[in-house]
């Protein structure tokens, strides 16, 4: 479940996901994949469920992003978030 977006509900990622609003911050070429990955995160109730399908390339990050996780949208873009208590917090596109 997605609990919060890093940019808040007025940010481009939240507006894209919740309202279907396009943004110059989100490339048109990744819109369908991005929506699908956000749906996967929204429906997840356990961290383990994020490992499947393997195309998610779910990983726990390290270094300066320790405590954060990510799912690949494509080779260039990924969704980064903190997974706590069965939910994703502060999700953003990078």
Identify what each model region corresponds to.
Residues 77-79:
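Histidine-centered metal-chelating micro-motifs
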């Amino acid at each position: 479940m997605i609990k919060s977006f890093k940019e808040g509900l007025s940010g481009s990622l939240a507006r894209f996901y919740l309202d279907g609003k396009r943004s110059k911050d989100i490339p048109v070429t990744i819109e369908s994949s991005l929506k699908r990955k956000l749906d996967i995160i929204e429906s997840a109730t356990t961290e383990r469920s994020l490992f499947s399908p393997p195309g998610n390339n779910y990983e726990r990050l390290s270094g300066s992003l320790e405590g954060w996780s990510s799912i690949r949208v494509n080779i260039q873009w990924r969704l980064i978030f903190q997974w706590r208590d069965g939910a994703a917090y502060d999700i953003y596109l990078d």
